[in-house]
């Protein structure tokens, strides 16, 4: 009993989820002003901003939640874990569903940004500081900017699939092609003069 009281009194994450649940009920009842009022009060007190229109399942755990943002059309499944500084945001380009869907048992590490209307498959992990802009298959691990799948079903993805060092450089390729053409052009008159 004492631990529960300490949890309620001391945990900003727990308080943020309580504020969200109240605001979401108001939002579903079309009491938008009061829903936003409760939501903003919760954000000011906890540092965690959860839009009352977001749909969140059971067992959400926000660890060290300062700076967590969950957008209006985000859908969060059951038993999801979010760490500090996570954003489930939109790109601002879509109408309607603009935010991501996180399936059950997803973990999003500190500072990761998941931006856009797509799905993160169940049991997936998003690495710290990653920026995810596209669909993630179930049972995957994603890291980097932009986010790339480095593990699927607990098996590493082949290195050539995630090579970020030897990326094509179209500008350099064009310069090399032009240099080659200029060398051919320079050598042609000499060849004609010898004939």
What does each model-found stretch correspond to?
Residues 97-109, 113-114, 145-183, 187, ...:
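C-terminal segments of enzyme domains that contribute to small-molecule binding surfaces
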Residues 3-7, 188-190, 195:
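Short, small-residue-biased leader/transition segments that mark boundaries at the very start
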Residues 43-150:
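Structural signal for interior beta-strand "rungs" in well-ordered beta-sheet cores
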Residues 2-45:
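A transmembrane-helix-recognition feature enriched in membrane-embedded lipid enzymes
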Residues 12, 135-137, 190:
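Short, proline-centered helix/strand-breaking motifs
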Residues 17, 33, 75, 170-173:
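Charged, alpha-helix-enriched surfaces in structured cytosolic catalytic cores
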């Amino acid at each position: 009993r004492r631990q529960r009281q300490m949890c309620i009194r001391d945990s900003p994450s727990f308080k943020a989820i309580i504020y969200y649940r109240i605001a979401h009920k108001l939002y579903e009842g079309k009491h938008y002003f009061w829903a936003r009022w409760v939501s903003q009060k919760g954000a000011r007190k906890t540092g965690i901003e959860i839009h009352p229109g977001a749909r969140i399942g059971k067992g959400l755990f926000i660890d060290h939640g300062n700076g967590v943002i969950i957008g209006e059309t985000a859908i969060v499944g059951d038993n999801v874990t979010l760490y500090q500084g996570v954003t489930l945001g939109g790109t601002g380009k879509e109408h309607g569903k603009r935010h991501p869907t996180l399936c059950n048992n997803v973990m999003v590490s500190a500072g990761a940004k998941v931006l856009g209307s797509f799905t993160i498959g169940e049991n997936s992990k998003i690495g710290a500081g990653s920026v995810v802009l596209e669909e993630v298959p179930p049972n995957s691990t994603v890291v980097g900017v932009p986010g790339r799948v480095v593990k699927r079903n607990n098996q590493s993805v082949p290195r050539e699939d995630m090579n970020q060092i030897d990326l094509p450089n179209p500008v350099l390729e064009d310069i090399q092609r032009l240099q080659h053409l200029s060398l051919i052009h320079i050598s042609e008159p000499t060849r004609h003069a010898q004939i």
